[in-house]
Each structure stands twice: as C-alpha cells, then as structure tokens.
Design a protein with these regions (language model features):
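Short, flexible, basic/aromatic active-site loop/helix in glycosyltransferases
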Residues: 135-160
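A short, conserved alpha-helix in the catalytic core of glycosyltransferases
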Residues: 162-170, 174-178, 185-212
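Conserved donor NDP-sugar-binding/catalytic core segment of glycosyltransferases
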Residues: 97-135
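Short aromatic/hydrophobic "clamp" motif used to bind/position activated sugar donors
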Residues: 85
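Short, well-formed alpha-helical segments that are part of the catalytic scaffolds
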Residues: 12-26
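Glycine-rich, basic loop-to-helix element that forms the pyrophosphate-binding segment
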Residues: 63-80
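A conserved acidic beta->alpha catalytic loop
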Residues: 23, 37-47, 65, 92
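Non-catalytic, C-terminal membrane-associated alpha-helical segments of glycosyltransferases
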Residues: 231-241, 247, 251-299
Length: 299
C-alpha cells in the first residue's frame, strides 16, 4: 500500500499519546498508525482500542508485558502495511508538511533512510524559540571522535551522514532487513545508533534533512516510557548498552570513526556519564542543603 505507516511504541504516556495521534493523522501522507502498547499500566490500551474503533487508520497490538523499544519497533514494523515506515514516538511533534518535505528530499537526494531536524524543546519554549536557540549551534553535525551528533543542528542543506536523529523514514523493506537489535535492554540506549550504523555499513544512504523538523518536548520529572527507571539504574543501562554497541560494531567504528581504543573510549564514556548525571547533580543538591542550613542558623 502506498503511503506511510507511522509506528509508535508507547508505555504509560497517555497524555502525550492523545496529542500525538491526531497530529500524525492530520498529515496527508500518513495512511495508518501502528501503535504498540508495551506493557502499559495506565489507560493507554483502552484509549487505543476506542480510537481504533472510531478510525480505521489506527491499528494496534498489545505486548501485554514490557518488551522494550527495539522489540516493540520491530513488531510494529512487521505489522505495517504501507510502502514506507516512519519510526514515531509518543511525545513527538512534527512541523507542517513534514512528510511531504521528507519524501521530496528523499527523492532528490537518493536517500534510503532520511531524518528531519530533531529539536529538543524546553517546556517553556515555543517552536519558534526552540528553532532560534538551536540555530545558534555550530560545529559538525557528527563528531566522529566522541561518536555523537547534534540532532537539532541547522545544516542549511541536506547532507549524507552515518548517524541521524531517531525519527526516521525509510522503505518498509529496509527496516525489515536491518531490524532493531532487541538485545539492547533497559532504556535501549544506542538502539537507533546501532540500527543506523549497520544500515550505513550495509551500503544504505542516510541523509539528514534540516528542512523538515520534529520536536521532542523536554518534560520535567518524566516518569513514562524509557524514563520510568531511577537515575542510577538509567545511567547503568546507558553504560552497559554503550559497551555492547561499541564491542559489537568495533570493526565498522574503526573504519568510519575516530574513537581510538574501544576500551579507553568505553571507560571514558562511563566515567563522564557517572560524573555528569549522578555525582554532579548530587553535589549540587548537597551544596544547596548546606547553604540552606547555614542561612537558617544565621537568621
């Protein structure tokens, strides 16, 4: 079937899913939504059942238990009936004419897999303010030494690169051939990077298109989806999955990137994550408490 199947895994994020579903359906190129209910404990399943009964373009499957993002994406892709799949998210917002723009630029660039600019927008910002802020970003889109990239950078023109923002558009058969690796557990860190790098290594052309924009709202105290675990456990999964990713793809990384010794890279990555996401925030809280105690005793 011509058109686009949008695959959306979701877990306990019903307020955001309610906004996302009609937004995707408003895009002319979208023929169906495939929602994968991944062990939700809220009223997501009931909402999706009712929405599907009202609109035949909405299809769903219930994992019953939480199987994780990669497994859920693969399951949704297998159920997709359109020629193209877009890997959606339950809190994603897309710009006007998003899919028309991506399809047009996919044709002109010869891209096999294409992603738009993905901006992480603060809750207090408007879309325009978030775009203006990220327009100031400089430097390369992909940093081959740190194995990272800026998903919201304004590159001005389309460009081929080995890493892309997570929301991707490609032919359904490509997603089914490459597949997400569902051995990435926990918060599934690196699942998209792993998929993209393997696709790149297989000869597929990956293109970043700044002319189509998606927005992820940075939600304070988000406890749904991959954010449902505690901070220490979340960082632990990031480190484990990064180790798995680097070890698994070490030959391709050595050929296409500049990370140096994989063991040293993995160690540096782990130290930086633990310090910036666990130790430093704890120090800030500790410092504030000391100042508060000092002010209280001085009053």
């Amino acid at each position: 079937m011509m058109g686009i199947s949008v695959v959306i895994p979701t877990k306990d994020r019903l307020p955001y899913l309610r906004k996302t579903v009609p937004m995707f359906l408003a895009q002319e190129e979208v023929e169906e939504l495939v929602i994968v209910v991944d062990g939700c404990r809220d009223a997501t399943l009931e909402y999706v059942e009712a929405a599907s009964a009202r609109d035949g373009r909405i299809r769903y499957v219930d994992n019953v238990t939480n199987r994780g993002l990669p497994w859920s994406r693969n399951r949704g892709i297998e159920l997709a009936e359109c020629d193209y799949v877009f890997t959606g998210e339950d809190d994603l917002e897309v710009s006007e004419n998003f899919f028309a723009t991506l399809l047009a630029h996919m044709e002109t660039t010869g891209a096999d897999i294409i992603s738009g600019r993905n901006i992480f927008q603060h809750e207090s910002e408007s879309h325009a303010e978030a775009i203006a802020r990220t327009n100031k970003a400089t430097g390369p889109s992909v940093n081959r030494r740190t194995l990272s990239f800026d998903p919201g950078i304004n590159t001005k023109t389309d460009q081929e690169q080995p890493l892309l923002p997570a929301p991707m558009l490609a032919r359904t058969d490509i997603f089914r051939k490459v597949k997400y690796d569902d051995s990435f557990r926990g918060n599934a860190w690196r699942e998209e990077t792993d998929f993209q790098l393997r696709a790149y290594g297989a000869g597929y052309k990956l293109v970043y298109c700044p002319h189509a924009i998606t927005f992820n709202i940075v939600i304070v105290n988000d406890r749904g989806g991959v954010h449902s675990t505690g901070q220490v456990k979340r960082v632990s999964w990031i480190i484990k999955n990064n180790w798995q990713f680097v070890t698994k793809n070490r030959e391709l990384l050595a050929r296409e990137f500049e990370i140096g010794s994989p063991r040293i890279y993995i160690a540096k990555f782990a130290v930086k994550r633990v310090f910036t996401e666990i130790i430093l925030p704890a120090m800030v809280i500790w410092k504030r408490r000391i100042f508060a105690t000092f002010r209280g005793s001085s009053a």
